[in-house]
Amino acid sequence: MSAQKCFESLVDEKVPVGKPAGLYQPCLVVGGLVYVSGHLPVQPDGGLILGCLGKDLDVEAGKNAARRAGLASLVTLEHCLGSLDKISRVVKLLGMVAATNSFTQHPAVINGCSELYAEVWGPENG
């Protein structure tokens, strides 16, 4: 299944295309690579998932938030490129996590986005 078809099958609710909150491009193609700006975890109703891991949110809630941020990034990529099929693989994922000082499970949280990308492009390319 193509990346675009896979993405379409995963999105059960519309994720709104975000608008830049400053002077930056949501995505930019340079030398055969596409760079996508940071994304927030947008809920189906357009609200944000907010909270602090280790205080307000547990690992599963954080993982879901990372997946939602990943979905938002995919919507931006689709909007900018026309199709996710134009992307052959993910080279880098940078995730930022709001957490207490004692929280140590950051990789488990960011896996929410990593697993989404692996679903779209396959485990070797996602």
Report the location of each language-model feature.
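N-terminal presequence-like segments and the immediate start of the first folded domain
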Residues: 1-94, 99-126
